[in-house]
């Protein structure tokens, strides 16, 4: 009765795990509503569209224009700071800003921000991993590039081919440079620079984009303080000077706006992706001789600021409406930017050439008004339940404590009020009042919408958390009953779970999670050593229990078994260096094998001949891979077929064997299944990881000789799964997902198959350990198997809940998108696939189903 | 995480001998007082030299190693009964008769035999093979004196140090036999330092590497860290137990009954294990470099284990035995 009930609670707990993941994810990765279609000019209030001040734009983009590179005294940008006798910035020909780039500070999301004006979400980063996924292109989104093209302009692009990926077919002329070779500091940039003189002579383009990669490469390779940096800055500066000279001299470039902007900065180590000040503070410069008329005066070079906020700080998304406005384009629909107020002054002077208006005020106001209406549309799209009709003006605006959306509402009502109040005649006082009201609304709306992108549905987060908490409480008592009976092992497991759970709240421990598993597993080795070395002369060897299953190898290594295990762990630990802090240090796959190719191949052949009864098949595998490349796909499929046939055979043979007679036959079917699976996993692993399976085999042999108790077997299996995952090079960074084996035997892209193969190739070692430990536990009865699943479920549910709790409490943490969210994604994979599919479903005796 | 000279493997007796009882601190005031001071002294030394340790771990570890050895020797000679110092044992005189060959050889016999026969096996038949192998090892050691240049100085230093400890004797004498105490203490001390250098240091270094210390780099750091841990763990163990096979078997299986000596040894190793915890943090502090946290953990673990072993946990053994199997557990419900 009790047994049956605990069985059901475990089942329910395992159903609750995916449910909690679904609920939590829906709150954690909110879907951002994007407006579709393209913006057009509306003619409503005031009836006038501010005319474009420029008709061409020249965008010089370089990774890592961290603002202190451009603006500080130590910068190599001499020309930008100094022009002729005067200074480019001082003369007012360049308007300098610091453009805040929100995380993730990697190129593709940043380009999205610059072109669409929207704030990229974390989902964009995930989508960008699937390169084949075409939904991440910006072809069908409203960008100023699309607006320019719709107006009939031609676009030209040289540099980083991310642009070409984002805008396929958009450019009239283009020469993409891949940023694959990070150690290339010169060629990537020369490939851009060589086109510039020609393009400057052409007058057919209306947007000319240059994206330099050199600074980025130097940053990644040598850091921001490397000697290469200053020379590269001088090189960039000379490009700026060349372009500016052309702007002054060439007639067709008279109305060209030159924008110099960085897509992201870099941290002290030269890397980017996170949200440290260095990474989020790229420079932004608007350059044109026309700006000199504004008579803006800025000091340059300036003092160095520790927070890198030079001049006026704007949002990176502000580039979009500003460019659109200056070029006389409609503002892209999804833009969350605010027209940079300093540049409104362009219409003060530009108005002189346009006789239509008596004063410059209307243009400025119209510009902001258009911006406001566009942003209002975006706000309405995201908050459909709020009304922005003037007649419904609520009284809440007078209260002090307003939530963000209400603040936006009130700001908008204020705008409407001032507009109505001033009527049609704009005197300077009224217009400045309108302007400030508009800007207030714009800023509030921008703040609201930018946070909406990373806004969490807290209720769902808590519901998800409590569901997983409920799953824990379901499993806790059955598991506790088991663990209390195995007090030392239970305490060890409890210690492991507790320390892991607290660890999830520290970003560096999440990054270096492998260290925890190596550390705790060595503790486990000591535990096993103390227990079984003690048994040896504690004369309790009679504890043999039932014959140890089907495991073929069973030498007795009681004395030094644990020591050998420790050695094997040490080898595995160094197999692949992973994580962040020590990732660059030498390891076996990265440093040893490249210089010892023969050793690798010797180990490989050893690994291949390790499963003797299947030698024929395993021999086939390399042959199939090595014969003619034409039919590689076919061969791979054949091997896959052979392997799956063997697996099915082993299952059926098992059934037949059960029904007929026991014993006889050296290789029981379950062993054959395991060996076949091993073969398949070998195929799905990186070549350099294959010899590690030999180490695993040594380990399982030692473990088999130890006669572990039920709980110990479970803990061992658990630890091995995690240890080997990291030993194979896995980590909690999305960049460590290995897709090199995800396409074996597949001709076309299929999300499901590629996904499954990706999982298998990344989780090959854990899968092997699940299967191997299942073999180790093959003598277990039903209760013991249930105990196994109970403990596994408790462990998984606790881990899941601690990760969720960490993501919830640290949702405003600097590293939420770079460390904790990837960890959460990995935990989903661990829970949904490795736990439920591989561990729990693998535990079900499929032969029972076949019998029916 | 036990320090394990290979003697147990040599001395695999068929019988499971009864182990040596937990060790008491010598029951006189000086011993008891110093036993309280000693761990604090070690921690104070560590705290005092911490900045120097962070600045240059290798130089600091190397220069402090003799001091540490000296302190440990002073501690064991002040506070602990040497191997073979049996109060209720008169066979020690018969052991002296075995002194026949060289000077050193004979003294080693003096150290070992009484420990084997008298104190350790009061009521059980002695394990001849263990005794034999122990003697063999010591003979070997004496025949092939330690080749290392820096560390052999410790035995001599300890000899030089003996006049200091001699002062303690009058008080000791109230509780113990007067004659030969100095010699009886000096020789186990020499033995313990020799074995610590030759056996425990390499074993602990290997253990450090197995637990994740860098294998290809940081060799001096690892070796010195191992040496410090060896001095912390093994000096007292060897001084008290000599090369008693059954004791070392227990050490190998980590199931000695807790006392100050074993508690400190186990505490050192557990502390070193926990000392690895702060290393992966991204604080980028200089003290997060490899051997420092491990060593600090070891020192703290030493003191904690020392204290716990003497008091709360005295006489208890680390035991890993499950109470029942799953099926039984279910039945119990």
From Swiss-Prot, chain A:
GO terms for molecular function: CP2 mannose-ethanolamine phosphotransferase activity. It is a multi-pass membrane protein. Pathway: Glycolipid biosynthesis; glycosylphosphatidylinositol-anchor biosynthesis. Its EC number is 2.-.-.-. Glycans are attached at residues 191, 420, 576. Pfam families: Phosphodiest, PIGO_PIGG. It is found in: Endoplasmic reticulum membrane. The keyword Metal-binding does not apply. The keyword Kinase does not apply. InterPro entries: Alkaline_phosphatase_core_sf (IPR017850), Phosphodiest/P_Trfase (IPR002591), PIG-G_N (IPR037674), PIGG/GPI7 (IPR039527), PIGG/GPI7_C (IPR045687). It is an enzyme of class 2 (transferase). The chain crosses the membrane at residues 458-478, 486-506, 516-536, 632-652, 676-696, 714-734, 750-770, 787-807, 824-844. SUPFAM superfamilies: Alkaline phosphatase-like. Coiled coil: none annotated. GO terms for biological process: GPI anchor biosynthetic process. GO terms for cellular component: endoplasmic reticulum membrane. Keywords: Endoplasmic reticulum, Glycoprotein, GPI-anchor biosynthesis, Membrane, Transferase, Transmembrane, Transmembrane helix. Belongs to the PIGG/PIGN/PIGO family. PIGG subfamily. Ethanolamine phosphate transferase involved in glycosylphosphatidylinositol-anchor biosynthesis. Transfers ethanolamine phosphate to the GPI second mannose. This is GPI ethanolamine phosphate transferase 2. It comes from Aspergillus oryzae (strain ATCC 42149 / RIB 40) (Yellow koji mold).
């Amino acid at each position: 009765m009790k047994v049956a009930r605990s069985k059901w609670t475990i089942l329910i707990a395992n159903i609750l795990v995916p449910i909690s993941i679904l609920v939590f994810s829906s709150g954690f990765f909110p879907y951002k509503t994007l407006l579709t279609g393209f913006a057009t000019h509306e003619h409503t209030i005031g009836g006038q569209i501010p005319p474009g001040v420029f008709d061409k734009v020249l965008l010089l983009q370089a990774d890592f224009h961290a603002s202190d590179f451009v603006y500080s005294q130590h910068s190599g940008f001499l020309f930008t700071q100094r022009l002729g006798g005067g200074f480019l910035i001082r003369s007012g020909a360049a308007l300098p800003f610091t453009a805040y780039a929100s995380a993730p500070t990697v190129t593709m999301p940043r380009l999205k921000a610059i072109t669409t004006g929207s704030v990229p979400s974390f989902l964009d980063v995930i989508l960008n991993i699937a390169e084949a996924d075409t939904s991440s292109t910006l072809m069908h989104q409203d960008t100023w590039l699309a607006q320019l093209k719709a107006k009939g302009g031609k676009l030209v692009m040289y540099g980083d081919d991310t642009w070409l990926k984002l805008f396929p077919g958009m450019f009239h002329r283009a020469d993409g440079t891949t940023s694959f070779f990070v150690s290339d500091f010169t060629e990537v940039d020369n490939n851009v620079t060589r086109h510039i003189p020609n393009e400057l002579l052409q007058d057919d383009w209306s947007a000319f984009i240059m994206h330099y990669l050199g600074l980025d490469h130097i940053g990644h390779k040598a850091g921001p303080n490397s000697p290469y940096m200053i020379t590269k800055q001088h090189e960039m500066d000379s490009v700026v000077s060349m372009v500016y000279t052309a702007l002054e001299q060439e007639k067709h470039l008279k109305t060209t706006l030159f924008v110099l902007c960085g897509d992201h900065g870099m941290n002290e180590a030269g890397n980017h992706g996170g949200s440290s000040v260095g990474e989020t503070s790229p420079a932004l410069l608007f350059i044109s001789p026309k700006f000199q008329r504004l008579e803006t005066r800025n000091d340059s070079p300036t003092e160095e600021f520790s927070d890198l906020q030079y001049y006026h700080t704007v949002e990176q998304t502000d580039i979009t409406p500003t460019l659109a406005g200056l070029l006389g384009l409609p503002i892209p629909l999804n833009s969350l930017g605010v027209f940079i107020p300093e540049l409104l002054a362009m219409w003060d002077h530009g108005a002189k050439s346009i006789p239509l208006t008596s004063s410059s005020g209307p243009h400025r106001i119209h510009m902001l008004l258009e911006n406001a209406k566009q942003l209002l549309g975006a706000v309405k799209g995201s908050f459909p339940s709020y009304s922005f009709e003037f007649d419904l003006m609520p009284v809440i605006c007078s209260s002090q404590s307003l939530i963000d959306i209400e603040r936006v509402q009130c700001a908008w009502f204020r705008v409407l009020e001032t507009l109505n109040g001033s009527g049609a005649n704009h005197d300077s006082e009224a217009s400045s009042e309108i302007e400030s009201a508009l800007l207030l609304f714009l800023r509030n709306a921008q703040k609201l919408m930018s946070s909406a992108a990373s806004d969490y549905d807290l209720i769902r987060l808590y519901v998800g958390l409590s569901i997983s908490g409920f799953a824990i409480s379901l499993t806790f008592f059955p598991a506790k009953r088991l663990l209390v009976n195995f007090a030392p092992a239970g305490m060890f497991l409890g210690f492991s779970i507790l320390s892991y759970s607290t660890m999830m709240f520290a970003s560096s421990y999440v990054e270096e999670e492998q260290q925890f598993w190596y550390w705790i597993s060595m503790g486990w080795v000591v535990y096993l050593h103390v227990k079984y070395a003690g048994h040896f002369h504690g004369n309790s060897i009679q504890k043999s229990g039932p014959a140890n299953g089907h495991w073929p190898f069973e030498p007795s290594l009681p004395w030094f078994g644990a020591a050998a295990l420790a050695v094997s762990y040490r080898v595995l630990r160094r197999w692949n260096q992973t994580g962040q802090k020590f990732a660059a240090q030498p390891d076996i796959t990265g440093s040893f094998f490249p210089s010892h190719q023969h050793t690798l191949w010797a180990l490989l052949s050893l690994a291949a001949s390790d499963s003797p009864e299947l030698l024929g098949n395993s021999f086939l595998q390399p042959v199939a891979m090595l014969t003619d490349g034409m039919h590689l796909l076919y061969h791979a499929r054949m091997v896959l077929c052979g392997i799956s046939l063997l697996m099915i055979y082993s299952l059926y043979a098992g059934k037949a064997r059960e029904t007929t007679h026991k014993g006889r036959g050296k290789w029981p079917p379950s062993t054959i299944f395991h060996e076949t699976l091993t073969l398949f996993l070998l195929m799905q692993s990186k070549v350099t990881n294959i010899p590690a399976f030999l180490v695993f085999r040594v380990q399982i042999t030692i473990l088999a000789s130890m006669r572990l108790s039920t709980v110990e077997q479970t803990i061992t299996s658990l630890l091995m799964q995690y240890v080997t995952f990291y030993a194979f090079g896995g980590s909690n960074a999305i960049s460590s997902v290995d897709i090199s084996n995800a396409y074996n035997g597949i001709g076309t892209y299929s999300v499901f198959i590629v996904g499954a193969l990706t999982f298998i190739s990344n989780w090959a070692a854990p899968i092997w350990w699940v299967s191997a430990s299942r073999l180790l536990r093959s003598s277990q009865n039903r209760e013991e198997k249930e105990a196994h699943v109970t403990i596994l479920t408790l462990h998984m549910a606790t881990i899941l809940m601690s990760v969720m709790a960490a993501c919830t409490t640290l949702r405003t943490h600097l590293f939420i998108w770079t460390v904790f969210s990837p960890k959460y994604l990995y935990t989903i994979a661990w829970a949904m696939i490795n736990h439920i599919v591989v561990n729990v479903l693998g535990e079900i005796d499929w032969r029972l189903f076949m019998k029916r | 995480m036990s320090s394990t000279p290979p003697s147990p493997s040599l001395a695999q007796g068929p019988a499971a001998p009864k182990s040596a009882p937990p060790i008491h601190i010598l029951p006189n005031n000086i011993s008891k007082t110093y036993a309280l001071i000693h761990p604090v002294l070690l921690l104070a030394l560590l705290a005092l030299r911490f900045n120097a340790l962070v600045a240059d771990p290798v130089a600091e570890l190397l220069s402090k190693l003799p001091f540490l050895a000296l302190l440990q020797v002073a501690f064991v000679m002040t506070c602990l009964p040497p191997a073979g110092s049996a109060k209720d044992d008169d066979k020690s005189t018969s052991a002296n008769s075995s002194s026949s060959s060289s000077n050193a050889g004979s003294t080693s016999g003096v150290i070992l035999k009484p420990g084997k026969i008298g104190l350790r096996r009061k009521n059980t038949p002695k394990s001849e093979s263990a005794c034999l192998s122990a003697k063999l090892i010591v003979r070997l050691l004496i025949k092939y004196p330690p080749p290392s240049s820096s560390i052999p100085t410790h035995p001599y230093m300890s000899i030089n140090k003996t006049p200091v400890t001699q002062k303690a004797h009058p008080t000791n004498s109230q509780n113990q036999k007067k004659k030969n105490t100095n010699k009886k203490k000096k020789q186990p001390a020499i033995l313990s330092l020799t074995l610590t250098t030759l056996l425990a240091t390499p074993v602990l270094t290997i253990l450090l590497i197995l637990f994740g210390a860098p294998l290809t780099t940081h060799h001096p750091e690892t070796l010195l860290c191992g040496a410090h841990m060896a001095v912390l763990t093994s000096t007292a163990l060897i001084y008290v137990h000599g090369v008693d096979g059954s004791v070392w078997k227990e050490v190998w299986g980590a199931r000695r009954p807790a006392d100050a000596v074993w508690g400190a040894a186990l505490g050192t190793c557990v502390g070193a294990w926990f000392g690895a915890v702060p290393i992966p943090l991204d604080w980028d502090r200089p003290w997060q470099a490899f051997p420092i946290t491990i060593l600090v953990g070891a020192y703290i673990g030493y003191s904690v284990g020392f204290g716990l072993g003497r008091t709360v946990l005295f006489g208890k053994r680390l035991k890993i035995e499950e109470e029942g199997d799953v099926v039984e557990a279910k039945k119990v419900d």
